């Protein structure tokens, strides 16, 4: 019995770490994963050193850009497909249909390719050719359609639904109102944050588009902490959610726009609905603050972030300042800047958006594109 116990202990120790030929300790805690879908999640939680020192707090950011598809949306993509499989709506050789303008489509393309499903994407025809080409490269069938409001039957989401209904063995995954999206973050992202912080966090903040990330993580952290952990919405210009929360639940007509993509909303989605009333507040983050933080994170932290990630970091900084020194605030780095570099680091684009002067002089060296 003793020898068996020792053997089990030694085996566990071997799994947890190994010596490399170069005397570097190499972790083997996770071992290999079985295919792309098992590589989704378990992303690092990074302490942003400069901002943490500046605020006297711990500002922690979850590196979702390290998912296989490059964004937090990989989690939702996997869960909406798994949900369709579990409910018998999707069988081998079937077709997944979604209306998406961005990262959810890329996540679905990776998941569907790995599982052997066909993927059809409807998106507004305002999207870049590069994004369309990437989805097609990943095996998706892409239909760019005129950009119209959600209440118009020709909206890209409604076209996606009708396309799925016209096929056998097909499912419209409906990322905005399919609560499997929220469940992905209740079952994965939330528990990961809780474990990575040892439960020692004071607040969480992030922006929202479908509502799944904010709602799912908020639900889990409030349940795990007995309501102690606060949660704040970070909202870009052009979204109605900040005013909805500040007014106590009054929806106004959406107006304005933002440089951010995939976040902001004109309605309360089914993913957000269960948890919007439990939020502790909201912050409206200007494009000027967002673009400056993109450049700051690159310069100070070596992090190459997309606009929604930078907006989240601004919000985390403001929440930390609100809570005071010694607080721990967690946010989400939704994706990197790789898909947006031709704009975010372009002098002409920044000038066209009136954002050139938002970049501090010492950071202008990163404006490397004409």
Swiss-Prot record:
GO biological process entries: amino acid biosynthetic process; cysteine biosynthetic process from serine
UniProt pathway annotation: Amino-acid biosynthesis; L-cysteine biosynthesis; L-cysteine from L-serine: step 2/2
Catalytic activity: O-succinyl-L-serine + hydrogen sulfide = L-cysteine + succinate; O-acetyl-L-serine + hydrogen sulfide = L-cysteine + acetate
Residue list for modification N6-(pyridoxal phosphate)lysine: 73
EC number: 2.5.1.-, 2.5.1.47
GO cellular-component term (any): cytoplasm
EC category name: transferase
Transit peptide: 1-16
Listed InterPro entries: Cys_Synth/Cystath_Beta-Synth, P-phosphate_BS, TrpB-like_PALP, TrpB-like_PALP_sf
GO molecular function: cysteine synthase activity; cysteine synthase activity, acting on O-succinyl-L-serine
A Pfam family it matches: PALP
Cofactor (UniProt): pyridoxal 5'-phosphate
Keyword annotations from UniProtKB, A to Z: Amino-acid biosynthesis, Cysteine biosynthesis, Mitochondrion, Pyridoxal phosphate, Transferase, Transit peptide
Location within or outside the cell: Mitochondrion
Assigned protein family: Belongs to the cysteine synthase/cystathionine beta-synthase family.
Role, per record: Catalyzes the conversion of O-succinyl-L-serine into cysteine, the last step in the cysteine biosynthesis pathway. Can also use O-acetyl-L-serine.
Protein name: Cysteine synthase 1
